[in-house]
Each structure stands twice: as C-alpha cells, then as structure tokens.
C-alpha cells in the first residue's frame, strides 16, 4: 500500500507517495522523537501526525481525520484543562467521555533504563454522560513528556502544552464472541418457541370459538387428544330446555342427526369417554375341541361305544 506523506522542503511542502510505507512507531520513538520535537517547537520534516483537538469529535470520526493509519491513528492534541494550570484535563466529547483506566505507566529508554522519557495513560471511551455511560471498544493511549521540575532547569522550556494520542479499537476476545453467539442462539430459540406457542394458542382459540360457548386452553389440548363434558355439565342444558317448555327439543334432535359432534368442556368437568361410545371388540368364539386337556380324553372308540351323556353334550 502506498502512503502519501507530506515532505517539508526548503520553500514548500511536497506530498510524495511512499510504496510499502507503514507507520508503526515504538513508544520510545513517539516520545523521544516526535512529541519532544513538537513540544520544543522544532518542525518535523514529515507531516505524518496532524494536530487536532480530538475531544471535539467522536472516536469513530477520527480515522478519517488522521494523516495516516489503517488500524492505529495518531494525533498531536493540545491539552485543554478545566481550571488553569495543574487542573484536570477536559476529556468530554459531544456524545460521551474518555475515562482513564488505572494509573500512568512510565516509559523508559531502551538504552538507559533508569531514564524516564515519558508517561503513558490508557483511556476508554464511554457513550453517555459521566459518571454513567456505556463502555465501547475505542481505546486511547495518551503519551506526555515527564515533568522534571527543578531538576531540568537547564533544559529548554516547552513552548506548547501538547500530548500525543494513539487511537485504536480493542480487539474483541474470542470468549466474548462465543458468548455473544450463544446469547443470540438462545434469543432465536426463545423467539421460535414463542411463535409456536402463539400459533398453538390461536388454533385453540379458533377451535373453541367454533364449538359455541365452551372454551378450553392449550394445555387441555396437549394433555388429551379429545375431551367430552361430564354428566354434571351436560345436564345443565337439558334442565334449561325443560324450563323453556320443551323449546330445546328440536335443537337436541338436530345435534343427534349431525355426523360428527365435538363437545369440549372446561378442565374442571372432564372425564374419559363413555363405554357405549367405543366400538365393541370383535373376538373369535372359543372351540372346545381345541382344548388340549379335553383332546387327550377323546378317542374314536369312545365316540362309538363309551360316549356318556356328558360327552355327547360337550362334543355334539
């Protein structure tokens, strides 16, 4: 990938394409070369890191404002304090705020581990207003030069109160992705079960509406294939018809002439179907000659000469 880099010449800046160029500086390079030069007022020959007040923009808008970067974006940010020198920086944006995580970490020189070249602060962006807010996956590393005080009296004073910020999105762990996927599967299973329950309830409602005034629940249909009213519940309509002077007799005749009659009762007046409504079980008649005990007692000689009246009664 070719990166467009602005090169500062003697009279003007010329933008050049550098094929294969990637900007992945180390923390020591960011502090000891880029930030220290900007703070001291030295001009860089390569305009790679732009100056921007990132707190006036949301983090998802910053990648389009960076000079360079694919997954990491760098900015020089002037420090905006709430109450004069030494106050707490204002890190509030239009739709959220940046919240620090932990304490600052000292960055030491690789050549001299005893020398601290800067401090690093890690912040996470939250949507909403402090102290409440929704945590996002946008992370910022803020680099600043250390304050040596009187020990660095001989050093040139800084001309600008500037920090260097690195913006990137935190990679989601595989475990969290698996948890999200399982949660989505559970939601889909729950929605499908809810659709099935709603469909079954609608079918039950339609069936109960077609039977007249008798209603039943979906649990009744699940427990029994077909239900009938008990004698106590079925006796009520006959009593009411007798009170009306026999006006319900034609209705009863019409119901008996119907080919199929489905009567559904409530769960408190259910009973098993009557025996008279079930078809009779057809079984073959028993043949006494097939009894093994009686077959042993029977012989042709007995058939001709010794048949008793009892034998005649059994075999003939």
Swiss-Prot record:
Biased composition (Low complexity): 230-244
Origin species: Oryza sativa subsp. japonica
Induction field: Induced by drought stress, salt stress and abscisic acid (ABA).
Function: Transcription activator that binds sequence-specific DNA motifs. Involved in stress response. Plays a positive role in drought and salt stress tolerance through the modulation of abscisic acid-mediated signaling.
GO terms, molecular function: sequence-specific DNA binding
Extra facts: Plants overexpressing NAC022 exhibit enhanced tolerance to drought stress and salt stress.
A GO biological-process term: positive regulation of DNA-templated transcription
Transmembrane is among the record's keywords: no
Transcription as UniProt keyword: yes
Subcellular location: Nucleus
DNA-binding region: 117-176
Protein name: NAC domain-containing protein 22
Keywords per UniProt: DNA-binding, Nucleus, Stress response, Transcription, Transcription regulation
Residues of the NAC domain: 17-170
Pfam families hit by this protein: NAM (PF02365)
């Amino acid at each position: 990938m070719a990166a467009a880099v602005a090169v500062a010449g003697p009279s003007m800046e010329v933008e050049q394409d550098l094929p294969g160029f990637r900007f992945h500086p180390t923390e020591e390079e960011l502090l000891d070369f880029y930030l220290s030069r900007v703070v001291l007022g030295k001009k860089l020959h390569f305009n790679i890191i732009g100056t921007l007040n990132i707190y006036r923009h949301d983090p998802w808008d910053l990648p389009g404002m960076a000079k360079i970067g694919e997954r990491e974006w760098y900015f020089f940010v002037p420090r905006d304090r709430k109450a004069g020198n030494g106050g707490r920086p204002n890190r509030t944006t239009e739709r959220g705020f940046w919240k620090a995580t932990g304490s600052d970490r000292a960055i030491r020189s690789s050549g001299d581990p005893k020398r601290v070249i800067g401090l690093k602060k890690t912040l996470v962006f939250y949507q909403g207003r402090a102290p409440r807010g929704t945590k996002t996956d946008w992370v910022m590393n803020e680099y600043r030069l250390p304050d040596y005080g009187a020990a660095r009296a001989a050093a040139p004073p800084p001309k600008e109160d500037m920090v260097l910020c690195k913006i990137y999105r935190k990679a989601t762990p595989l475990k969290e992705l698996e948890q999200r996927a399982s949660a989505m599967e559970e939601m889909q299973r729950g929605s499908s079960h809810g659709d099935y329950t709603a469909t079954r309830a609608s079918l039950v409602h339609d069936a109960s509406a077609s039977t007249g005034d008798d209603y039943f629940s979906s649990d009744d249909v699940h427990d029994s294939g077909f239900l009938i009213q008990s004698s106590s519940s079925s006796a009520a309509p006959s009593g009411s018809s007798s009170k009306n002077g026999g006006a319900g007799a034609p209705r009863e005749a019409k119901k008996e002439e119907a080919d199929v009659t489905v009567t559904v009762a409530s769960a408190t007046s259910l009973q098993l179907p009557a025996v008279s409504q079930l078809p009779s079980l057809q079984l073959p008649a028993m043949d006494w000659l097939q009894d093994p005990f009686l077959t042993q007692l029977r012989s042709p000689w007995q058939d001709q000469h010794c048949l008793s009246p009892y034998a005649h009664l059994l075999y003939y």
